[in-house]
Amino acid sequence: MPPSEEIKLRAVSPRPDFKANYLEFANAPAIVRANQKDSYFETVLRDKLQNVIQIFKGQRFTHTHPEEIGVAAKALYLSLTTLLGTKTLGEEYVDLIYVSRDGKRIPRYLARAGFIFAYAILPYFLTRLFRRLKSSSTPKDEVTEEKINKELPISLRIEKYLSNMSYSKVLDTIMNLHIAVFYFSGQFYNISKRFFSMRYAFGHKINKERTPNGNYELLGGLIVLQLVMKSLGGFKGLIGSFTGNDEHDESNLRANNKDIMYGIPSEEEQEEAKQQLGIIDLSDPGQLPYIPESSRQCMLCLSYMTNPTAANCGHCFCWSCIIDWCKERQTVLCVGKKCWNSNCYHCIRLFYIPTLNKICFFFLLSFLSVRAASKEFKSTKEEFAELFNEELADIAGEDPHCPGPFPTGRTLGYFLVVF
């Protein structure tokens, strides 16, 4: 063949399909499985990190900073894998790798670092910022705000209605809408990945004949339907404000004020609530002064007990601390019953959670406190403390696991009868 004809054949020959060499993008089920696996290992790393921090900083620090420890564990997990350009354990489980939006290259270092900051660290600061804004915002005049002025134009009414919406509801709506879009398209599981153009692709060749055809479009449709129903309810409330439905306006204002996520009360409100509800806080020396200082601290949070609660073994903790402990340390689930067992933190003895003596113990200590503060009982206050501790010392002789200056559940009825 002459050289001229060979050149002509090369010129008219079709160009190779470079797209055939690209990796195939991952589908939604594979991405969800990888995310679930990563969430599990992040939890394991958080527990290990919490144990290490507990050795150096103490148990009280781990109980007062659980959110910070979770953020640190998530950032550490992604920094050791994604930031260094390696796969996470979840990505290794289903063989996924990060590629750019068009699938032609691997995401750069700055994109990976920005994704880790936006995914693991930024939500923590946003949450703290929203909480601070919520707590620092001064309440407006309730009389003028409960009823929307009918003389205002529609634009100002809409602006007032939107101003009553909380940050948490807006963020939840955005997240639900984004996850619905992911279920339909299967492209970006997180908003941060969409912002930094980080998509998942399979690291191996996919056999489409063996790949199941099912996907998550149905879940996306259900989420969209839920958002539509919520939007209709909000639109109905907006129309009701224009038509003068004051009852609906007041209910909306009450619902907006009851923001569970960001409505953290101030210290003054907490103290006022404690006085109204009669909560026992042993940090106050004036409450139950006959209890020794060495016995006023909780063994879980290492701070003064709030609403002391006695287990069957007699050891006492804060009500919230022992409930959180029981939720994390459930041992044997009762079959056919709504109860479960747990072990005491101090003596590791088994007890039934429904038998925690918070109410009875609270009533007993309140009753004894009133008797100790009465005029006829002040003269024998020291004698009462001695008798109280002697009785409990006898009980401790019968039960070596009794903590000493607090009654066990077995003696609560006895003291109620005596006093």
Curated annotation (Swiss-Prot):
Changing H315W: Loss of activity. Its main location: membrane. It is a multi-pass membrane protein. It is an enzyme of class 2 (transferase). Keywords: Membrane, Metal-binding, Peroxisome, Peroxisome biogenesis, Protein transport, Transferase, Transmembrane, Transmembrane helix, Transport, Ubl conjugation pathway, Zinc, Zinc-finger. A zinc finger (RING-type) spans 298-360. It is found in: Peroxisome membrane. InterPro entries: PEX2/10, Pex_N, Znf_RING, Znf_RING/FYVE/PHD, Znf_RING_CS. One of its GO terms (biological process) is protein ubiquitination. E3 ubiquitin-protein ligase component of the peroxisomal translocation complex. The two types of peroxisomal matrix targeting signals, PTS1 and PTS2, are first recognized in the cytosol by their receptors PEX5 and PEX7, respectively, which then carry the cargo to the peroxisomal membrane. The peroxisomal targeting signal (PTS) receptor-cargo complexes interact with peroxisomal membrane protein (PMP) components of the docking complex. This is Peroxisome biogenesis factor 10. It comes from Komagataella pastoris.
